[in-house]
């Protein structure tokens, strides 16, 4: 999304679902999206906010100080980056979606199947030990409520329009 292989002002609508958060510089990404949009064009995307997987983050924090869960930009930072692009009107909305799992491993397997890997610079180098993993599983289990384990997804919906 930071270097789209498209001609300038060639697209009426851009739609992206859960890809934008992997771009390192949101202002470059928004400038690139604005470049390819025709006047009157619209971009709609979803991204993840900082409360995403907060339960998993807390469970790992009980084990060590390494960053095991990806961090995501707050909605205000995304909005500020988009508003720095001339000729763009932006509207962002946020929705916190609680998910429920019967086992922590179900959540971990789902994340692995999605291809969600830890992209943080201060993540733990090398493989995670069995002991650390067991510690995280125990810490996460402490959050079990009514037979299920919560997992929060903090979803940001962005709509921006090119004048």
Regions found by a protein language model. Give the residues of each.
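A short glycine-rich, Lys/Arg-flanked "PGG" loop and its adjoining helix->strand segment in the class I
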Residues: 27-42
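Conserved Class I S-adenosyl-L-methionine
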Residues: 89-163
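A short SAM/SAH-binding and catalytic strip from SAM-dependent methyltransferases
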Residues: 12-27, 47
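Conserved catalytic/acceptor-binding region of the Class I
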Residues: 38-104, 117-125
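A short acidic, Gly/Pro-enriched loop at the edge of an enzyme's catalytic core
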Residues: 2-14
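Short, glycine/charged-enriched secondary-structure capping and boundary segments
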Residues: 11, 28-30, 58-61, 105-106
